Amino acid sequence: MKNTILILFTAFIALLGFFGMSAEALADPIADPLAGPNAEADPEAIKWKAILDAVKKVIG
């Protein structure tokens, strides 16, 4: 029973992530996909991109 709940919860979170990213892409359809996140479409994405870039820099 615990495994079933865990699997369903994980699938739910994965779907939220997928549709969340799709919604961001739909919010700014003319944006260049290689340009990075658009601050107007998702201001929080800029913060996460900066954190990810810093982690990549530290790791190498």
UniProtKB/Swiss-Prot annotation:
Q: Write down any Gene Ontology CC term.
A: extracellular region
User: Looking at the keywords, is Protein biosynthesis present?
Assistant: no
Q: Which residues carry this modification: Isoleucine amide?
A: I59
Expression sites (tissue/organ): Expressed by the venom gland.
**Top-rank taxon:** Eukaryota
GO BP annotations of the record are: chemotaxis; defense response to bacterium; innate immune response
One GO molecular-function entry: toxin activity
May I ask which residue range the UniProt record assigns to the signal sequence? 1-27
Described function: Antimicrobial and mast cell degranulating peptide. Has broad spectrum antibacterial activity against both Gram-positive and Gram-negative bacteria (S.aureus MIC=32-64 ug/ml, S.xylosus MIC=2 ug/ml, S.alactolyticus MIC=12 ug/ml, C.koseri MIC=4 ug/ml, E.coli MIC=8 ug/ml, K.pneumoniae MIC=32 ug/ml, P.aerugiosa MIC=192 ug/ml, S.choleraesuis MIC=32 ug/ml, S.typhimurium MIC=32 ug/ml, V.parahamelytics MIC=16 ug/ml). Affects membrane permeability of E.coli. Shows hemolytic activities on sheep, chicken and human erythrocytes.
The protein here is known as: Mastoparan-A
Q: Which organism is it from?
A: Vespa analis
